[in-house]
Amino acid sequence: MSLSGMAIRRLITKGVIPVCQVAPLSTSAEGSTNLKEVLSKKIPAHNAKVKSFRTEHGSTVVQNVNIDMIYGGMRSMKGMVTETSVLDPEEGIRFRGYSIPECQKLLPKAKGGEEPLPEAIWWLLCTGDVPSEAQTAAITKEWNARADLPTHVVRMLDNFPDNLHPMAQFIAAIAALNNESKFAGAYARGVAKASYWEYAYEDSMDLLAKLPTVAAIIYRNLYRDGSAVSVIDPKKDWSANFSSMLGYDDPLFAELMRLYLVIHSDHEGGNVSAHTSHLVGSALSDPYLSFSAAMAGLAGPLHGLANQEVLVFLNKIVGEIGFNYTEEQLKEWVWKHLKSGQVVPGYGHAVLRKTDPRYECQREFALKHLPNDDLFKLVSTLYKITPGILLEQGKAKNPWPNVDSHSGVLLQYFGMTEMSFYTVLFGVSRALGCLSQLIWARGMGLPLERPKSHSTDGLIKLALAAKK
């Protein structure tokens, strides 16, 4: 008797089946290497499931919304459908049901590598299946073939002034790729709504193929005197080509990129960038415009600046007490920092109630490859002392480190010290999540998003009426 993928995942979670003993759970891993063909079978089956569910439970109430939720940025309000990932308060992000450690075990890796390939997480996010090596290689081959940038985008990037922020350049270049949109062309021709996802898929594959080149040109223009990016090597994977185009030929940096791009790829649908791409996409804007808008959201300091703020914090510590500190001296410094009304960046999370697994896998990478790096040792000591301090202070619901507490330190170690570029890296990664969500939104025929808004006076009337 065979177990379903979900049943096996539950057994993994409970420890009944060790992760390392589980073969890929994919129903498509033995089949086609054509992702679009696989999706053409999965989308109708999923839509039938949704139709049946809505027929039976369409009027079921799943949450009561209170006034604080409305004024509080709709935090924790159940109001979206996102199939690609779910954030568990205890286990962290799950990509199609798989935890970070499970993805690290199960997803295909580069030859000789230890970190999962972003091509594999893309297949997983799109299908819910762990891909085979052949399916992963097919994505690599397709992205390499689609990577060329149109001349007008290269010219635009080369003509941007040096003082234009890298995220502004990234956003503009993505939008400027829209003249190649297959989705926009298909809509103009009046194709059937049921086919929208196919053109969203084509645009998404094209955009993912081109993003590393866009990002690399921005980086080389701003920080490497405009030196030309290397050409795509068809023998290299997405991350290895990206690393080379940036100017980093250390194979270990490519491994870091694989890890970074996978763990930052998706985080449910309610964060600013994912929600923005969904909202703009719901108006049937093409994936280029939708993702460009998402990146404008990511550029906001409350969304995409966190790992830079951690580095500023670490450099402040080093500037005041150096690297030859004792644990007690560091405790005193953190307490002084908190008592001055400031926070410890990189600690706490809106949903998680334990150490972020994305932090833990970066820590494991550092312990293996850079255990004696001074900044990493500072991060490690902070990890040892800060949760206890925050618990004693009594203000933090979650005193544990999140993903942003570590990523900047790893990039610094390999020589990428240009902090203003870090959000662009984040954006390249987050494209995997935003665009897989967008394909499914069009495949499911999700409608234009249009929530009802109220004035404060209107809410007062509603609240008073509810109390009668």
Curated annotation (Swiss-Prot):
Its EC number is 2.3.3.16. Keywords: Mitochondrion, Transferase, Transit peptide, Tricarboxylic acid cycle. GO terms for molecular function: citrate (Si)-synthase activity. NCBIfam families: cit_synth_euk, PRK09569.1. Homodimer. Citrate synthase is found in nearly all cells capable of oxidative metabolism. This is Probable citrate synthase, mitochondrial. It comes from Caenorhabditis elegans. The gene is cts-1.
